[in-house]
């Protein structure tokens, strides 16, 4: 099986998660910045990682997802964000990545907290959105992703790859309840 791990990372958070995922893959594999990827057509499965920007994928990330996630290609999404994983506001933001990747067979999705960049926090603190201003003020993301979160990414990668080897991978859960249950189980 040929596997691609590709990521977009401005601050290094998503790159760290990509590297943790990559470490656990024993099949033929490549890791690259998403900007270096022309196509995912020649891979059996692609792990694609992005940070959340302004409550979802930024325009570049959305375009890349729409470009690569076509024809039912098997894709695993991994997303980093400054919010804690149990944040009530997070699921709709993650859904925006699923929508952008809707042409793919989304095998699974992983998300974890990453450290909010200081310049981004300053920008968020003056935006019109009260929610974003509050997040900037209440930021608790220093040092993320930590060892525990990176270990979770490694375990997630092993689980996905084991499922593929066993031909038991299913399309990512669609209902909010199923996604919440999956997120809780993936932390255990």
Regions found by a protein language model. Name each.
Residues 1-2, 75:
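Short, surface-exposed connector motifs at secondary-structure boundaries
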Residues 2-26:
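N-terminal beta1-alpha1 ligand-phosphate binding loop
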Residues 23-30, 45-188:
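FMN-binding flavodoxin-like domain, especially the glycine-rich phosphate-binding loop
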Residues 30-42:
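Short acidic low-complexity segments
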Residues 5, 41, 45-48:
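Short non-domain terminal segments
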Residues 4, 15, 32, 156-159:
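A generic structural signal for ordered secondary structure
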């Amino acid at each position: 099986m040929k596997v691609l791990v590709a990521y977009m990372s401005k601050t290094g958070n998503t790159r760290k998660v990509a590297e943790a995922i990559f470490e656990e893959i024993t099949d033929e594999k490549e890791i690259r910045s998403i900007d270096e990827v022309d196509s995912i057509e020649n891979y059996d499965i692609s792990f694609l990682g992005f940070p959340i920007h302004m409550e979802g994928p930024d325009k570049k990330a959305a375009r890349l997802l729409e470009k690569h996630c076509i024809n039912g290609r098997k894709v695993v999404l991994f997303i980093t964000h400054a919010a804690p994983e149990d944040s009530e506001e997070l699921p709709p933001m993650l859904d925006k990545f699923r929508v952008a990747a809707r042409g793919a067979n989304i095998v699974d999705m992983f998300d974890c907290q990453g450290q909010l960049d200081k310049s981004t926090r300053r920008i968020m603190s003056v935006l019109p959105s009260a929610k974003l201003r509050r997040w900037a003020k209440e930021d608790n993301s220093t040092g993320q992703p930590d060892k525990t979160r990176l270990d979770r990414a490694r375990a997630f990668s092993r689980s996905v790859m084991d499922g593929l080897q066993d031909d038991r991978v299913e399309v990512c859960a669609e209902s909010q309840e199923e996604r919440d249950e999956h997120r809780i189980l993936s932390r255990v």
